[in-house]
Amino acid sequence: MKKIIQAVAASSLLLLAACGSNEGSESEGKEKLVVSTWGFNEDFFRKEIYKPFEEENNVEIVLDTGNNADRLNKIKQGNSDVDVIFLSDYYAQQGIQDGLFDTIDRENIPNVDKIYDVAKAPLGEEYGPAYTIAQFGIAYNPDESPIKITSWKDLWSADMKGKITIPSITSTTGPMMVDIASMVKGEETFNEDAAFTSLKEIMPSVVKEYGQTSEYVNMFAQGEIAAGPIMEMYFADLKEAVPNAEFVTPAEGGYAVMNTMNVVKGTDQKDLSEKFINYILGKEAQEKSAKNKVDSPVNVDVQLSDEEAEGLTYGEDLINSLHTMDMKFVNDNLKGWIDRWNRELIQ
């Protein structure tokens, strides 16, 4: 009897070892796709977005997370094995100008035909599309603001003195503030001198510039400010702090902030990378992200109810009304703008 038990135990151990070996072989046999992205909502993306792609393509997605600047710098330094990188258009343009991205074959990304025109080639036909668009507009507290905010020009009103914040020039939306300042002066095309004259005029109204959204939220919640430009995707945080807060698409139009996907130069997974980009643009992935309030959809086939669309940059009319900036022009001129900002505006 003892021998029988020993034999059964030995067989069990062999079976477990075999199972473990098979599991290891399965994992080792899978292709890996390294995706560089932000760390927010990681659980959602792993379960709802990445897992279906992994199962369908027998691939393992490995994430490299961090902010735009750090992740781009890692690739620039050459110590990265990233295949696909998600970046805001502002940082993606830097990567393009530094020669860090491969060109894409749009025949491998047919879902590009299903997205809004503005998202198809925000940085040129040779590079990746945008998979989401955030609106840069104005949030304000009607209980604290002496005027109703409907326009960019309202931020320059004398009534708003000591009541607003604006993004710092080095933040993602800082360059947009320069463009807005030119527009407020009545310029039909960008005029740098007019912009900085306009910015000088608004500075007495600025309590503090913000570099991080959390700074804006804190000032807003504590009643230090009554209004300021912000991306709509962060408005939920303001609404939680101040339930009466309102988000406004200015009469002159908001600005589009786009997050893009690009294939990193040197990858040996170019085809798989393009397949992944196509998948992210598909209706199913776009709809999941939108309905979970994670990203605003660019796929035109995604249909949302008013409740589902609340807080998202959604709908053809709104998307088409947004201003876009030439990111190459921004990057070529940003150093000069930063110098002028620090020299002329910072006291």
Describe the predicted segments one by one.
Residues A92-Q94, A221-Q222, A227-N244:
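A ligand-binding cleft/hinge motif common to bilobed small-molecule-binding domains
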Residues F40-R46, D81-A221:
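Extracytoplasmic ligand-binding site segments that recognize negatively charged/polar headgroups
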Residues G20-N22:
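Bacterial signal peptide processing site
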Residues A134, T197-I202, V242-K265:
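Periplasmic-binding protein-like
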Residues N320-Q347:
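Conserved C-terminal helix/tail region of periplasmic/extracytoplasmic solute-binding proteins
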Residues N259, V264-L322:
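Mature extracytoplasmic/periplasmic domains
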Residues L15-A18:
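C-terminal motif of bacterial Sec signal peptides marking the signal peptidase cleavage site
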Residues E28-Q94:
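Early extracytoplasmic/lumenal segment of secretory-pathway proteins
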